Every structure is written in structure tokens, then in C-alpha cells.
């Protein structure tokens, strides 16, 4: 009897790499808790502040998510709709998260995402 090999969960984070399959559509909620280095106190994200998540392939910008109005705390949703997902072909991407409050601060740099090819073999 033959077995069907199942796909790995998509999207997923494994060894600090964000994976998903090419053409997948999904929404993933992120929550970022910022701590002031000087005081050790939490930084309160204001409604006027901004989070920018940028994806690059070979240092070429692929897509940018921008969020304001943080009325739900420090949470925001990356919506990989059909329009967004089709920008991401198989391969490795770098992503960065920038917080813009009273200052502009890179809070995540040189993290990686891997878009995997799905192949149907008969």
C-alpha cells in the first residue's frame, strides 16, 4: 500500500525561519512587546505610531506591510492575500520590522523567510 506524503504546516516558523508554500494565502497575527533599554519598562505603542514590515529578495523590495492605529495592543496581522502571495515565488527572502514612534528603530533585521515550491508528482 502506498502512503500519501503530507505537506508541512504552512505557514510555520522553524529554527527562526518563517516558511510557507508558494501560492498559499493566509493571515498571521504578530505581537511585538518592546522594552526600553534604559529603564526596562514596556514601551506603549501609540495609535499614531507605525510598524513597517519589509520583505526583500536579493536586496530588492518585494512587499511592505504598514500598520498604525494599534487599538488592539501591540498586535498586527500580515495578510498574505492572493495579490500579496503572488509576489513571492520560490526562494529565500529577508524581512525587517521597523518601529516608528518618536524615533525610527529597526527592531528585527536580517530574519529570513523561505517560500517553498509545492510539486504534484503522479
Regions found by a protein language model. Give the residues of each.
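Contiguous segments within soluble domain cores/interaction surfaces
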Residues: 1-122
Amino acid at each position: 500500500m502506498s502512503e500519501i506524503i503530507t505537506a508541512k504546516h504552512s505557514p510555520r516558523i522553524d529554527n527562526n525561519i518563517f516558511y510557507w508554500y508558494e501560492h498559499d494565502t493566509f493571515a498571521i497575527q504578530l505581537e511585538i512587546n518592546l522594552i526600553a533599554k534604559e529603564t526596562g519598562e514596556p514601551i506603549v505603542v501609540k495609535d499614531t505610531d507605525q510598524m513597517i514590515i519589509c520583505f526583500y529578495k536579493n536586496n530588492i523590495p518585494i512587499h511592505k506591510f504598514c500598520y498604525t492605529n494599534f487599538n488592539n495592543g501591540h498586535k498586527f496581522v500580515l495578510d498574505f492575500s492572493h495579490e500579496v502571495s503572488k509576489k513571492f515565488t520560490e526562494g529565500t527572502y529577508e524581512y525587517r520590522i521597523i518601529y516608528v514612534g518618536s524615533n525610527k528603530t529597526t527592531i528585527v533585521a536580517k530574519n529570513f523567510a523561505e517560500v517553498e515550491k509545492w510539486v504534484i508528482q503522479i
